[in-house]
Amino acid sequence: MRKVRMRVTGRVQGVGFRFMTKMVADQLGIWGCATNEDDGSVVIEAMGPDEALETFIEKVKASPAPYGRVASFTLTENPTIE
C-alpha cells in the first residue's frame, strides 16, 4: 500500500474540488482526506494500491471538478499517513 501527500493550488476551493476528489477516490478504492488550507490550496493525504493511486493522482492533476483548475501540484511520498 502506497501513501502520498499532495498539495494542489489553482481554482481548487469553492468549486467542488474536494467533493469530486472524494468521488474519484471512492470509485478507485483510495482512502484519505482532503483539507482546504488558508493559502487557498488543498492538501490531500491518500493511500491505496499502487495502480489505483497512480490513476487517482492523474485525475487530481487534471482537476476532478468541472469548474476547478490546477495551477500547481506537488507530491510527497508519505509512509506516516495512517
Segments from the language model and where they lie:
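Intrinsically disordered, low-complexity, mixed-charge
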Residues: 1-82
